[in-house]
C-alpha cells in the first residue's frame, strides 16, 4: 500500500496460488535453488518440494544452513551457493525466517550481478503469521554487533506464493499458537495504521475474526482442516 499527497494505491504484486500448486510452476523450469531451514531438511519435509522437482525433471540444490533468525553469515553463504549453482528459479520452503533469508539471498545476488536478473522467486510458507511471502521487507541480523538490519525494497517481493494448508497443519500446537497470535497482532497493527484504507481494513477485520473463531480449534486439533 502506498499513500501520497493526492492519491492512494493498493496492490498485491505477488501472485498467490492456494493449495498444492507447485506442480503448475515447474513447466519450463530447469534449475531450482531450494532454500529452507535445517529442521525442514533434516526431517525430510523438504521433499514436499524436491519430489515435485524430480517428477518434472528439474535439477535442484538445497541450501538449508538456516537456524533461527537469518544473519549475515547465513545470507553470505547462501549468496555464494546461488552464484555457483546459477538457477533460473529459487524456491523457499519454511517460516518467516527462512523466507527472509531467501529474500536477502536473491536480493544481494541480483544486486551484485551474481544471479540471473530474471530469476523467479517462489515462496512456500509453512506457518501463518509473518506474511513474509507477500511483503517487501526482510530483517537480517549482525550477531557480532547485535544489530538487526531491515531491508525494504519492492524487489524483495516473491513472484509467487504457494499457500498450502497441509503444510500449516503439520506444525506443532506451540507453533500454531505462536504464529496465530502473530496473525492477530499484524491484523490489529494494520487496522490502526496511519496508512490504512478500506481495502486493508477489510483484510484486517477478516483476519481478526478468523483468529477469534478458529485459532483455539486449530491448536487443539491440528488436523482439523476447517
Regions found by a protein language model. Give the residues of each.
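N-terminal amphipathic/basic leader segments beginning at the initiator methionine
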Residues: 1-29
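A glycine/threonine-rich phosphate-anchoring loop and its flanking beta-alpha core
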Residues: 110-199
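Conserved beta-strand elements of the Class I
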Residues: 32-34, 89-91, 122
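Short beta-strand/turn micro-motifs composed of small residues
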Residues: 36, 94, 141
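N-terminal small/polar loop signature for handling phosphorylated ligands or for N-terminal nucleophile
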Residues: 46-117, 216-225
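Active-site segments that bind and position negatively charged phosphate/pyrophosphate groups
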Residues: 194-226
